[in-house]
Amino acid sequence: MSETTNDNYGASSIKVLKGLDAVRKRPGMYIGDTDDGTGLHHMVFEVVDNAIDEALAGHCSDIIVTIHDDNSVSVQDDGGGIPVDIHPEEGVSAAEVIMTVLHAGGKFDDNSYKVSGGLHGVGVSVVNALSDKLQLTIRRQGHVHEQFYHLGEPQSPLTVIGETEATGTTVRFWPSSDIFAITTFDYKILAKRLRELSFLNSGVSIRLIDKRDGSEDHFHYEGGIQAFVEYLNKNKNPIHPKPFYFTAEKDGIGVEVALQWNDGVNENVYCFTNNIPQRDGGTHLAGFRGALTRSLNSYMENEGMLKKEKVATSGDDAREGLVAIISVKVPDPKFSSQTKDKLVSSEVKSAVESAMNEKMQEYLLENPADAKIIVNQIIMAARAREAARKAREMTRRKGALDIAGLPGKLADCQEKDPALSELYLVEGDSAGGSAKVGRDRKTQAILPLKGKILNVEKARFDKMLSSQEVGTLITALGCGIGRDEYNPDKLRYHHIIIMTDADVDGSHIRTLLLTFFYRQMPELIERGYVYIAQPPLYKVKKGKQERYIKDADEMEQYELTLALDGAELHISTNAPAMNALVFEKLVAEYNSVQKLIGRLNRHYPAPVLQGLIYQSPISIEMMKEESAVENWGKSFVEQLTAKETEAHQYSVRTQFNAERQVYEAVITVRKHGIDTDYFLNFDFVHGNEYAKIVSLNKQLNGLLEEGAYVIRGEKVQPVRSFEQAVEWLVKESRKGLEVQRYKGLGEMNADQLWETTMDPNSRRMLKVSIKDAVAADQLFTTLMGDEVEPRREFIELNALRANLDV
């Protein structure tokens, strides 16, 4: 645990290690890979680590991470706020020193922070150096201070912009597209790490908000890694009530372990060093496994169980159904690479091994009832392993395969290089037939799967092996299965493509196959070998013309193109037609804003958002005058009331934002006698979404005059608004349009299947990846496990998001 030893954390506590140019020259050394997204997300974690350090020192309890609509990220904490006084050596504010000098911060001054969670990091200055723009907001000593930076250079001194009683720091940054190949943040990657941090730092509240699509999570767990294990076992059946937990220190190394067995067959062990996850384990995992096997074996030996049961157990049996977290605190850890995926510090193995051995033996002796349950499960696992071995031998002896050693249903390809070979797993024999005819025989193999394959989430290993469809699949893949025989390097195809129908059964079969790969061959997903084919959703016919359409977005685009084909907009009775390109661009922008309104609908009612398109814009400058905001609000409410068709009543008032020194409009909507307030606050008016609405507003305002009309073909339609013009054109274009929704692959002939789904030059595929292993594990357990209640909750929670095709 961190402790603060000096309350005077100010400018003089900040220790400086200089040199920021090196960061821009070799960003990969400081932040990780700038091409594959790891460095980009590390930027967020670097800022979050600073807030976590504040929390560990007892200064902060709430951290809010927001992905904004413009792909910037802000990290806000309610800590003490970065010091704003002038630094004695540097002559500028301490905040500016922290933001512009490499490795500057209170973590290097032993009196301010005794233990630092973010010490492995490189400081927020690196984030600043690699951002096109960074906005720093500090709430401290009654004032709000703000400063902007560009690629690490301050654009102005730290300035007081408002007053506040709150304290804390907000860092918002826009990563530089010149440095990062990808600048789009992935919600799942951030959620995975923030969830880990909230468990590893018990009691810290971390909120993650995605303004792009409204996703939101709140990670707040008391109970540390013990709670983490309980969370991982949620929706599973733990076989003993309370997780085994201990914390110890050996030779200056802190060891913390929590574990609990469930009645499943999968092992889930997560390792951390100084809060950093090791995907590939390392010396702490080796020490843990060695001690676990040894202490359990010695217990079973002493109790005479192995003799009585006549069974030989292995370490793998002991880890069946095991969920464990190993967290070590090491003063100077050594990793196998820059990514810190594997710990190689040799002293950690003996520290973990001796602590684990001692505590596990104590636990087994002090909890005989739990020990008996655990040991019985291990003995059952050993028996199942033996049964599976016999089943495999039996299969070999029976010669269930054809002469080539491959299943008869498999139509193999000629190519022998796995990197160039593709295996299509096709639902049903009819689609399998079309695929076999339509494929490229050189590189594409087809394996039709009949009916639904076994749900491996619920089945024991020996039952799984006796399933015909699973057996066929394992043989075709060629990489074996089970701990003794599985070798992903022997895989015969590096593109395994799941191709199922676009109906409920197809989705179920796809989920069953994904469950199989995730539980039995996770390396194939990790190596990027598993794909999902994306056959077209629609076939549209207009007259004699036919075309395939991939998804709803493309359908919308197609309808728009059709609507504008030969269409003309005349803005008044005698005006010539608007330029076709200008009209098309305006319609595209209008549609983009309509989608934006759909997204914002969770926060503001649609009539208010639609009204903003036609209301003269409000600016930050206007918001400095209360009377200007009042007048704007009155005019807006009049416009809303005039358009009102439902029983809604609107009113407006203003509120003062002391932090920003501006007046904000508050729109009150009364519906069925209930008042709801909607705040058009500084952040909204200053944000990207409102900027897009204003841009459209400027183009539409006063565009149509008296007598405006739209023409399409022979038809003429008078219109009063641009919205009316677009709606009429789309409605007209749909006349005579036949839309066929594809549900089965068998509905396409071989040529159509090749052209739309299998031709490498034109097909679209989704690559299956696991960005958040914990969330993936939870989802597979919820959807495919034994427990019905969590599945019902999941359906109730997500029912409204389902896209029904009735």
From Swiss-Prot:
Q: What is its main location?
A: cytoplasm
Q: So which cofactors does this thing need?
A: Mg(2+); Mn(2+); Ca(2+)
Substrates-to-products reaction catalysed:
ATP-dependent breakage, passage and rejoining of double-stranded DNA
Q: Which domain of life is it from?
A: Bacteria
Q: Which residues form the signal peptide?
A: none
Quote the EC number: 5.6.2.2
Q: Which Gene3D superfamilies match?
A: 3.10.20.690, 3.30.230.10, 3.40.50.670, Histidine kinase-like ATPase, C-terminal domain
What positions does the entry give for Mg(2+) 1 binding? Answer: E427, D501
Extra facts: Few gyrases are as efficient as E.coli at forming negative supercoils. Not all organisms have 2 type II topoisomerases; in organisms with a single type II topoisomerase this enzyme also has to decatenate newly replicated chromosomes.
Which HAMAP family does the record cross-reference, listed alphabetically? GyrB
The protein's assembly and partners: Heterotetramer, composed of two GyrA and two GyrB chains. In the heterotetramer, GyrA contains the active site tyrosine that forms a transient covalent intermediate with DNA, while GyrB binds cofactors and catalyzes ATP hydrolysis.
Q: What is this protein called?
A: DNA gyrase subunit B
Task: Tell me which species this is from.
Answer: Haemophilus influenzae (strain ATCC 51907 / DSM 11121 / KW20 / Rd)
Gene field: gyrB
